[in-house]
Amino acid sequence: MSNTQHLGTKFIHAGAHPDPSTGAIMTPIYQTSTYVQSAPGVHQGYEYARSQNPTRFALEEAFAVIENGKFGLAFASGVAATDAVMRLLVPGDEVVAAHDMYGGSFRLFSKVHEKMGIKFIYVDTSNPDNVIGAITAKTKLIWVETPTNPLMNITDIEAISVIGKKHNCIVCVDNTFASPYLQNPLDQGATIVMHSATKYLGGHSDVIQGCLVMNDEALRDQLYFIQKSTGAVPGPQDCFLVLRGIKTLHVRMQRHCENGEKVAAYLRQHPKVARVYWCGFTDHPNHDIAEKQMRGFGGMMSFTLKDDSIAAAIKVLSSTKIFSLAESLGGVESLINHPASMTHASIPREQRIANGLADGLIRLSVGIEDAEDIIADLAQAIG
């Protein structure tokens, strides 16, 4: 598909090919574990569903298209996709990673891959000098989230990619919070893009999935081998759901962005709110970088109350009626979350506080309901 097409057209048609036998416009769900061969080793390109599945292949093509990449790979979850990238490394290798990343990524790094001899150095990647200062001869990977979860810090993808190339490091960007509608890290020089497709790509809170997109064929072959060998693949039903979700990504993201701007502005003027973390504010520390590399600022944000007690935060978290108290994000419905006890509970409190993630921080995934109803819900919950 041509990269000159507008985003909506690209998302609707990504990975879509009419079924040759029936003409079905939607990719069929190939619910099979194996494929018949006419003779040993003689087949139609499909041997076993862990290695090949037509529904998954269509989705992987779509992933590549929407991220302006050449190769896409689908995984059973975002964490599985992250794990695959880590398996490119060998004992003794080092990783420079964002210090305020998603708690699940931190858990994977600190509790699984550190035991395998990988060293992780956590820095504030929003300042490229911090990354440069952390790189050694053993550094093989730079792991970036932008915007970060949940503090919405912004990292200059282009600047970090230049650093990575200079030091022969893979640069992998977790693009989950932005989605391909708002940001395409490969265009900024990144080596790999990772998504938890559970979030905005699926968009309906009904599937768990992850993906990787890259341009380098040799790297794709390595990651495909890992995908196949570890078996971290999604089933065809899940692939179908994400394929369907991608078709409406652009219209959903437009509403997420519109609602996000309204909610952020409301919270900022609320007398009981101390601070709002949203990268669309012109006084956000790296707003100029966000404006340069993003098409909009999305519906993810966090805030703290002037009463910074956990009890005050819990009162808000337990009082919403439209916002559902739940982990995850990026669905059509609005979600409210307490990172300290939910998504980031695996990070030691001292480290979490040092990174700026307060006990009373509240994270919002602003959905696509009517903005007036979303704001009214926050108003009654905050009081």
Language-model features, listed with the residues they occupy:
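N-terminal glycine-rich, Lys/His-bearing helix-loop that initiates the first secondary-structure elements
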Residues: 1-46
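Conserved PLP-enzyme active-site core in the AAT-like
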Residues: 2, 71-272, 277, 288
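Positively charged, small/polar-rich N-terminal and surface patches that mediate targeting and assembly
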Residues: 2-8, 14, 275, 330, ...
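Glycine-rich phosphate/pyrophosphate-binding loop
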Residues: 29-30, 38-58, 62, 335-360
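Conserved N-terminal alpha-helix of the aminotransferase class I/II PLP-enzyme fold
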Residues: 34-83, 87-88, 104-111
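PLP-dependent enzyme catalytic core of the Aspartate aminotransferase-like
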Residues: 110, 119-121, 137, 307, ...
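Short, well-ordered beta-strand elements within core beta-sheets of diverse protein domains
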Residues: 241-251, 299-307, 363-367
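Conserved small-domain helix->loop->beta segment predominantly found in fold-type I
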Residues: 261-321, 325-330, 347-353
